[in-house]
Design a protein with these regions (language model features):
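Hydrophobic alpha-helical segments
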Residues: 83-170
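Small-residue-enriched transmembrane helix-hairpin modules in multi-pass membrane proteins
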Residues: 1-110
Length: 170
């Protein structure tokens, strides 16, 4: 009984509370990601590789965006009685990058690419299109929690599926 209501509250109320909490952190620190927040999973591995192979230091700006995005995994008080982590929602990453315009533009892009992958899956049958569609479906379903492109393993997995796994043999 109450577990269902607790789960519903968690899934629908926490994103609002934690978005507000982490929005204040971004505003207080005057952080603007300019795309690095939303695409952290793609960008950070490049700098990490350069740091470890060529000893080129990661720019402080990139490290700051990466750190604040990872800090959302820390448990914070979402209400007087509940602590939670990660439920910042996809909107927060777009907010961190370009504030409210970022939310609008980012969600338009997510909608466009979700529709396009759905259409490609319907008209061009194949495991690659279906896999990419599943990634976008996962992103939409879990948009109340976070954005998958901010997680290195998800972003690299997407690149692997899109460009390597189903590469056509000549």
């Amino acid at each position: 009984g109450s577990d269902v209501w607790d789960n519903l509250w968690t899934d629908f109320a926490l994103p609002t509370s934690l978005f507000e909490y982490w929005k204040k952190v971004v505003d207080d620190q005057n952080v603007h990601g300019y795309g690095l927040g939303s695409l952290n999973g793609f960008v950070y591995p490049v700098f990490y590789f350069l740091k470890n192979i060529f000893k080129i230091p990661i720019p402080e700006y990139v490290e700051a965006i990466h750190t604040i995005a990872n800090d959302t995994e820390s448990f914070v008080w979402a209400s007087n009685t509940v602590t939670a982590n990660a439920y910042v929602s996809i909107y927060w990453y777009f907010y961190m990058d370009f504030r409210y315009i970022g939310i609008l533009a980012g969600m338009l892009l997510v909608g466009y690419f979700s529709e396009r992958t759905y259409r490609d899956t319907l008209y061009y049958k194949g495991a690659k299109n279906f896999s990419i569609y599943c990634f976008f479906l996962h992103m939409v379903i879990f948009s109340i929690v976070r954005m998958p492109f901010t997680i290195v393993s998800s972003a690299l997995g997407f690149l692997f599926v899109a460009f390597i796994l189903y590469k056509k043999k000549i």
